[in-house]
Amino acid sequence: QYLCGSWSFLDFELAVGPGVLCPRADTEVVAQAAAETLAGIAAPRVLDLCAGTGCLGLGVKRFCPAAQVTCVEKSPEAFVYLEKNARCALTGQGRQTENVLEPSALEQADVPAFDWGPSLNALRADRKPAYAVQPVQGDLFTYWETLPEGQLELIVSNPPYLTAAEMEQLQPEVAQEPAMALEAGEDGLVFYRALAQHYKNALCPGGALV
């Protein structure tokens, strides 16, 4: 995947490279199952945590074009791919213009400012991209503090889940991927505990955590 620079997910291509976890085929099933929880909701609000490439959030958006999706990723290296995929992955996949987040929507979010250098800053100011999903650089362990209660119909996440012992026995091809996207403490459950403890209040009545 890293050599190709892209990888198929559902019916679209995702940019991948060193520093981001390559999407797995079984994640497509998770995206579809998550999107099915949104049936009958006109404009569902969705949060994708530990987003990586954005595959889950973009997958939900693909199945449910009216969804308002925010994808949160901590790693600066992975965020580069998330932002690119948020801008490009669903292009030509039947999206309607009203389902694309214009720059003004992104600017209103709590997104860190990046210094791209004078020339690139000027270019970005003049030609800011539109996004299919809203990319935000943030940490699962603290991002919950920014969320109002009862506002989300769906939270999706494919967080790190390997134990410390499993990290020492990785297959060579998996060992090439970022440890930050794989390692989850001694028992592999540290991210799941944080999700269960801190994010349930952000869901509206009937909302789902997948």
Language-model segment annotations:
Residues 103:
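Internal, well-ordered alpha/beta segment that forms a basic, Gly-enriched binding/recognition surface
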Residues 63-67, 72-94, 106, 114-116, ...:
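S-adenosylmethionine
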Residues 6-8, 123-128:
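Short, conserved catalytic or adaptor-binding loops enriched in Gly and charged residues
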Residues 52, 109-110, 117-120:
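Exposed boundary/loop context
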